[in-house]
Amino acid sequence: MAVTDLSLTNSSLMPTLNPMIQQLALAIAASWQSLPLKPYQLPEDLGYVEGRLEGEKLVIENRCYQTPQFRKMHLELAKVGKGLDILHCVMFPEPLYGLPLFGCDIVAGPGGVSAAIADLSPTQSDRQLPAAYQKSLAELGQPEFEQQRELPPWGEIFSEYCLFIRPSNVTEEERFVQRVVDFLQIHCHQSIVAEPLSEAQTLEHRQGQIHYCQQQQKNDKTRRVLEKAFGEAWAERYMSQVLFDVIQ
């Protein structure tokens, strides 16, 4: 059954989240609406989750879809009490089409957005993006932000076009959102025109995606938050089945 409405109006979290997160969630949903979406089935108990973290209520909303070119398109919205808002999004491609991985994360607190990262991460063995992506991204130019953040030790999975910043003002927030929209426009277009690869090339991109997921699972900050709220076993299951499931 095709998905024809990606409206986020049924989200209980959306109205309570940081404005930049709301803006970005709507932009992601709008870009996905142009693709032939079908539902992606998450484990039944992991679509909507409630827990407690250090006395605060933790709520997680997950939305997942798929297309012929993307095996899984995941948008997560989360809130911890009144102090922490989170957006997490990854588009996992089918290796058959040789596409990179789109990823975006926003973390916001009472003082505003503390971290914003977005990238089109390569799955080729040479760690380069396909030529068509490089051409389109180079034409965009590099946006300027005052506060660049340092990538984690496992950040070699990201491309040279990765943005990891702390926005200094509303103008920078809007600039970041626009760059994510640019990434998505390029990505969705390339997915539509992508041709199937050979078996050997498909295997190469499959291995690249496995490496990406394995590295992302090393994110100690995410794991610690989940472990505190739900325990180690639950956190491992969520990390490996919802956030970064390794393609079989």
UniProtKB/Swiss-Prot annotation:
Enzyme class: oxidoreductase
Coiled coil ranges: none
InterPro entries: Ferredoxin-dep_bilin_Rdtase, Ferredoxin_bilin_OxRdtase
MF GO annotations: cobalt ion binding; phycocyanobilin:ferredoxin oxidoreductase activity
Pfam families per record: Fe_bilin_red
EC number: 1.3.7.5
Record field: catalytic activity: (2R,3Z)-phycocyanobilin + 4 oxidized [2Fe-2S]-[ferredoxin] = biliverdin IXalpha + 4 reduced [2Fe-2S]-[ferredoxin] + 4 H(+)
Top-rank taxon: Bacteria
Keyword Oxidoreductase tagged: yes
Record-annotated disulphide pairs: none
GO biological process: phytochromobilin biosynthetic process
Record's keyword annotation contains Transcription regulation: no
Keyword terms, alphabetized: Oxidoreductase
Family: Belongs to the HY2 family.
Function: Catalyzes the four-electron reduction of biliverdin IX-alpha (2-electron reduction at both the A and D rings); the reaction proceeds via an isolatable 2-electron intermediate, 181,182-dihydrobiliverdin.
Name used for this protein in its record: Phycocyanobilin:ferredoxin oxidoreductase
Organism: Synechocystis sp. (strain ATCC 27184 / PCC 6803 / Kazusa)
Gene that produces this protein: pcyA
